[in-house]
Amino acid sequence: MGNCCWTQCFGLLRKEAGRLQRVGGGGGSKYFRTCSRGEHLTIEFENLVESDEGESPGSSHRPLTEEEIVDLRERHYDSIAEKQKDLDKKIQKELALQEEKLRLEEEALYAAQREAARAAKQRKLLEQERQRIVQQYHPSNNGEYQSSGPEDDFESCLRNMKSQYEVFRSSRLSSDATVLTPNTESSCDLMTKTKSTSGNDDSTSLDLEWEDEEGMNRMLPMRERSKTEEDILRAALKYSNKKTGSNPTSASDDSNGLEWENDFVSAEMDDNGNSEYSGFVNPVLELSDSGIRHSDTDQQTR
């Protein structure tokens, strides 16, 4: 009979086997549980240290209140379940309020970000418009107002091209004025010696100068003489030296020994009617005429 009472009593308490029960007095927390060893049922108590409860982070069990202990003793399990449901609803309501608050804060943050981006974009557009207006009406470095018209753009382009051309042209003139070939240098020496030895005035010189549009005088480099022309000049000079009885000149002084006719500057026309080459001495014709006269004198001597 006693075993049956114990079995019924502990069968009801088996459902609440994991629940905690605080026993008054003593100072320590005590737990009780039931276990069956064969047919005999015994109660075992475990005395736990309070510090162990704080050190166990995984334990989420809350201690039983006095009302719950009374309800357990009186077997009012429905009231315990109702109280737990009310507590769960209260917790869920608080969580819902917190979630709604977080959602509103996030929406306000997103709205503020969108508004800031819209304001930044508007400021950027206003700044670009202001810069465009300033560039359109602000005076440039040349003191002229810039305009977006096609004619003004074309004129400014022409001015830029002209300035670049002037710089390039001045650099080319300065470089070409100092470039002289060896034949040109010897020709310049020849003209200098001819001026000093001849009795003609400065108007009879062979200074070929070209006056460009900027008013600068630049000497045109002379064409380099070929080998045939040098041979003809050398033969003409040798014959003239033999005729006058002077000492023969060396091959290096042939170009410097060239003499000009006294009637170099003349207004006579040549056979073709061109006065451009009038006054120049043709060494080929001179050589042929002198050769014919020399052969005639030899025949008369014989």
Curated annotation (Swiss-Prot):
Bias (Basic and acidic residues): 221-233
Cell compartments where the protein resides: Golgi apparatus, trans-Golgi network; Late endosome; Early endosome
Molecular function via GO: AP-1 adaptor complex binding; kinesin binding
Region called Disordered, residue ranges: 188-258
UniProt keywords, alphabetically: Coiled coil, Endosome, Golgi apparatus, Lipoprotein, Palmitate, Phosphoprotein, Protein transport, Transport
Transmembrane segments: none
Function: Necessary for adaptor protein complex 1 (AP-1)-dependent transport between the trans-Golgi network and endosomes. Regulates the membrane association of AP1G1/gamma1-adaptin, one of the subunits of the AP-1 adaptor complex. The direct interaction with AP1G1/gamma1-adaptin attenuates the release of the AP-1 complex from membranes. Regulates endosomal membrane traffic via association with AP-1 and KIF5B thus linking kinesin-based plus-end-directed microtubular transport to AP-1-dependent membrane traffic. May act as effector of AP-1 in calcium-induced endo-lysosome secretion.
PANTHER family documented for this protein: AP-1 COMPLEX-ASSOCIATED REGULATORY PROTEIN (PTHR34529:SF1)
Annotated stretches, region: Interaction with AP1G1: 78-138
GO CC terms, sorted: cytosol; early endosome; endosome; Golgi apparatus; late endosome; transport vesicle
Phosphothreonine: residues carrying this PTM: 228
InterPro entries tied to this protein: AP1AR (IPR031483)
Assembly behavior: Interacts (via coiled-coil domain) with AP1G1 (via GAE domain). Interacts with KIF5B. Associates with the Arp2/3 complex.
Biological process terms in GO annotation: negative regulation of cell motility; negative regulation of receptor recycling; negative regulation of substrate adhesion-dependent cell spreading; protein transport; regulation of Arp2/3 complex-mediated actin nucleation; substrate adhesion-dependent cell spreading; vesicle targeting, trans-Golgi to endosome
Biased composition (Polar residues): 188-206, 242-255
Protein name, per record: AP-1 complex-associated regulatory protein
Pfam families tied to this protein: AP1AR (PF15745)
